[in-house]
Design a protein with these regions (language model features):
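Hydrophobic alpha-helical scaffolding
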Residues: 11-12, 24, 28, 63, ...
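Short acidic (Asp/Glu) and glycine-rich catalytic loops that position anionic groups and cofactors
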Residues: 1-2, 14-18, 54-59, 75-78, ...
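His/Glu-based metal-binding/catalytic segments typifying zinc-dependent metallopeptidases
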Residues: 1-33, 42
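Short beta-strand-to-loop capping motifs
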Residues: 5-7, 63-67, 163-164
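M16/insulysin-pitrilysin zinc metalloprotease superfamily fold
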Residues: 49-108
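Buried hydrophobic packing residues in well-ordered domains
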Residues: 3, 20-22, 38, 61, ...
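C-terminal regions of mature proteins
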Residues: 97-166
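Short amphipathic beta-strand starts and helix->beta connectors
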Residues: 41-48, 143-146
Length: 166
């Protein structure tokens, strides 16, 4: 099952970093709400995650589920986003997510495809993303209110469910 959402943030604007953190809290890491609540606690999915495309304004939640869990899983997935909109997450979860993003950024500095992608983005947008200290300082400033603001701009656009024939 896939749930597709639109949000008005674009690459490089002031909502860029809060959206990255919000996605991390939602489904970007193993400690995320989708993974912890839908997969681990409720056992409704064998795989679950969310992905963010900062260039198109598209957020995707996806889950591998059994068809009989379809409605319950969809409702529970939506509830994880609603929890973020209402600020139902802890400072520990927020800090853990920011730490994971920091480590991902540091690891990307030693990855050829990440370096090529970053050079392409710099050429395309005329901006330099190489100032990691500044980027991390901005990341540290993101708080619960910033997450709630960006989460409240996320709107459901499409639901896709594919099932086989028995």
């Amino acid at each position: 099952m896939e749930l597709g959402y639109h949000y008005p943030s674009k690459y490089g604007d002031e909502q860029h970093l809060p959206m990255i953190v919000m996605n991390g809290l939602l489904g970007g890491f193993a400690h995320s709400k989708l993974f912890t609540n839908v997969r681990e606690n409720a056992g409704l999915a064998y795989t679950i995650s969310s992905e963010l495309d900062l260039f198109s304004g598209f957020l995707r939640m996806y889950a591998g589920i059994n068809r009989e869990n379809r409605n319950q899983a969809r409702k529970m997935m939506n509830n994880q986003l609603l929890d973020l909109k209402k600020g139902y997450f802890t400072e520990f979860e927020l800090n853990q997510t920011k730490e994971m993003i920091r480590w991902s950024l540091l690891l990307s500095q030693d990855n050829q495809s990440s370096l090529i992608e970053r050079a392409y983005q710099n050429a395309l947008f005329g901006k330099s993303s190489a100032d990691f200290k500044s980027w991390i300082a901005k990341l540290e400033q993101i708080d619960k209110d910033a997450i709630c603001r960006v989460a409240n701009n996320v709107k459901l656009q499409a639901i896709y469910f594919m099932e086989g024939i028995e």
